[in-house]
């Protein structure tokens, strides 16, 4: 097990391991940790959720996407697999890379994945399917469930550039996603966190039984995690929706 540095240990002391925090308290703690850790880069704030599902069963799979209200705080590179009129629309909408067979072959030959989001028109998917072994493990494969297989390429590009985050439960029932940078104002981080949690709640599959969310925590890229009070967070979500 890797040894923790002095600053990490100091940051850990800020967290009460026996307490479950509100989102507001947790973001305040992350801000304090950032001051202690003194990283030389703008750390990403990450959300982790442990769900009471078994993704081996189709009716317990959790997958979706969310457009964070305040984005991710970084430029998003978008690839669009399209031809003809759709390719023209994608270029006009600001896609970073647009193409058909040539772009697909480039990814196949070079295993090139220097982009954050991949979008495809439905007619391109039989060809894009060949990229599954490359794009799939990196979470880049276009999917109708996340809105990245569509004829409305302009809207998909707009959402991606704004900071749409895709999520998918792993084999152990965990969901991880970035929700912004620690340099964001507190309220913007809180807004993004509520939006992300709400998206996972709405993605609850029909086969999920009992308490859907078992654990929830936030952290920086390289910091201790802060566990959240699930009931309090869900209560606030309901109040926001009312």
Curated annotation (Swiss-Prot):
This protein's record includes keyword tRNA-binding: yes
Cited PROSITE patterns: RIBOSOMAL_L1
InterPro entries registered for this protein in UniProt: Ribosom_uL1_bac-type, Ribosomal_uL1, Ribosomal_uL1-like, Ribosomal_uL1/biogenesis, Ribosomal_uL1_3-a/b-sand, Ribosomal_uL1_CS
Annotated GO CC locations: large ribosomal subunit
Gene3D superfamilies: 3.30.190.20, 3.40.50.790
An MF annotation (GO) of this entry: tRNA binding
Claim: tRNA-binding is one of the keywords in the record: yes
Keywords: Repressor, Ribonucleoprotein, Ribosomal protein, RNA-binding, rRNA-binding, Translation regulation, tRNA-binding
Pfam families: Ribosomal_L1
Disulfide bridge map: none
Spans traversing the lipid bilayer: none
Coiled-coil zones: none
One BP term from GO: translation
Summary of subunit composition and partner proteins: Part of the 50S ribosomal subunit.
Described purpose of this protein according to its UniProt entry: Binds directly to 23S rRNA. The L1 stalk is quite mobile in the ribosome, and is involved in E site tRNA release. Protein L1 is also a translational repressor protein, it controls the translation of the L11 operon by binding to its mRNA.
Family statement: Belongs to the universal ribosomal protein uL1 family.
PANTHER family documented for this protein: 54S RIBOSOMAL PROTEIN L1, MITOCHONDRIAL (PTHR36427), LARGE RIBOSOMAL SUBUNIT PROTEIN UL1M (PTHR36427:SF3)
Protein name in UniProt: Large ribosomal subunit protein uL1
Name of encoding gene: rplA
